């Protein structure tokens, strides 16, 4: 019973830190927040965005073509509180606070009834869950983005909830349907979700495939159909000109050099009489995976794991607490010790998802020219807090 009170206190702390003077701190809305707020207000009043498009599934915004979830979620608080800073930031603070509770239940669900090695045997799942929730509640990384209008805060909430429902499905099969639904809808929540959500879902299915397709075959068919239907609806969005513009503006891959190399190789193939195999191995899509691009992506990936990015500066002044890293210095020894302990004593089939989640987090930002990027990698969380 006492631990339930601790959870309530942790949630109240998280709620206070995210809502206290939300309309004043940070001072003034930044341009992205203004655009999202005005789009939400326009939807409320006219059903159209600021450019006159009726109920769009991609918001043109500042010509950066945003996913739709945040704008639609902001409609209700703007209707209730008016068009102001507090109302625009309300969805981020609200779902950021709820994420703390969901993380608690996820960690408890995953670590419950597990047999761990050596000294890990005496640790209770509820204790790990409470500590994870507490560290996330005071995380400067999560707190910073929960106090401003960032789509990634909503996306992280959906990801944690989808994984929780997946594990709940082993107790009640109907939760697989909810998990699949949220994994699918999450694709519309943030650009990075297009990479992270499917990879997390695939990892979960492959990890438990034997159990899923024997004991829960009916649920898997239903859940699969739900995700496929949503994904089919999402495909036109993913390949729309607006989405392509967003990708071309942010990516760091050298398409021009790849296409030039592809054209040269195809000419050589034609002269050698091997045009069939040339079309397979030297086409412009395969050519993108050249050594220059692979080196750039891998370098960007590991930049997100450096102490400088995590503990000193995040690279963008507006994306971090001034004079403070994404993770506090005092958390460093606990993070290192926790990660080593997890790998040695707590890693098994059921907990593997946290390691995979941790490794998947930097992928979306690794192909962009602004790497390392704290917003595009925020789906990293809450693995850091779980390891701590």
Indicate where each model-derived feature is located.
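Membrane-integral, polyisoprenol-dependent glycosyltransferases
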Residues: 2-296, 300-388
């Amino acid at each position: 019973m006492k631990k339930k009170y601790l959870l309530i206190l942790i949630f109240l702390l998280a709620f206070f830190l995210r809502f206290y003077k939300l309309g004043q701190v940070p001072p003034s809305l930044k341009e992205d927040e203004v655009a999202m707020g005005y789009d939400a207000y326009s939807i409320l009043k006219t059903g159209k965005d600021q450019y006159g498009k009726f109920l769009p599934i991609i918001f043109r915004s500042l010509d950066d073509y945003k996913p739709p979830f945040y704008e639609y979620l902001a409609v209700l608080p703007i209707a209730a509180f008016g068009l102001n800073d507090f109302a625009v930031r309300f969805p981020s603070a609200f779902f950021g606070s709820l994420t703390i509770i969901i993380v608690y239940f996820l960690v408890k669900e995953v670590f419950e009834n597990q047999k761990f090695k050596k000294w890990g045997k005496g640790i209770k799942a509820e204790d790990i869950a409470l500590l994870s929730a507490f560290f996330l509640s005071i995380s400067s990384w999560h707190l910073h983005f929960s106090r401003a209008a960032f789509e990634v805060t909503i996306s992280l909430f959906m990801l944690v909830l989808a994984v929780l429902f997946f594990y709940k499905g082993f107790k009640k099969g109907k939760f697989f349907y909810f998990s699949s639904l949220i994994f699918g809808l999450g694709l519309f929540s943030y650009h990075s979700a297009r990479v992270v959500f499917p990879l997390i879902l695939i990892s979960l299915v492959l990890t438990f495939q034997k159990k899923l397709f024997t004991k829960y075959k009916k649920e898997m068919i239903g859940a699969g159909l739900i995700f496929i239907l949503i994904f089919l609806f999402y495909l036109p969005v993913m390949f729309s000109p607006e989405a392509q513009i967003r990708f071309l503006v942010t990516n760091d891959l050298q398409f021009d050099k790849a296409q030039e190399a592809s054209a040269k190789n195809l000419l050589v193939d034609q002269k050698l009489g091997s045009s069939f195999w040339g079309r397979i191995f030297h086409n412009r899509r395969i050519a993108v995976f050249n050594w220059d691009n692979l080196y750039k992506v891998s370098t960007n990936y590991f930049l997100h794991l450096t102490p400088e990015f995590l503990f000193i500066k995040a690279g963008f002044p507006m994306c971090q607490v001034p004079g403070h890293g994404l993770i506090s210095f005092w958390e460093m020894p606990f993070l290192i010790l926790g990660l080593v302990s997890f790998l040695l004593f707590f890693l098994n089939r059921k907990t593997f998802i946290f390691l995979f989640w941790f490794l998947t987090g930097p992928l979306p930002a690794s192909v962009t020219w602004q790497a390392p990027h704290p917003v595009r990698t925020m789906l990293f969380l809450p693995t850091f807090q779980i390891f701590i």
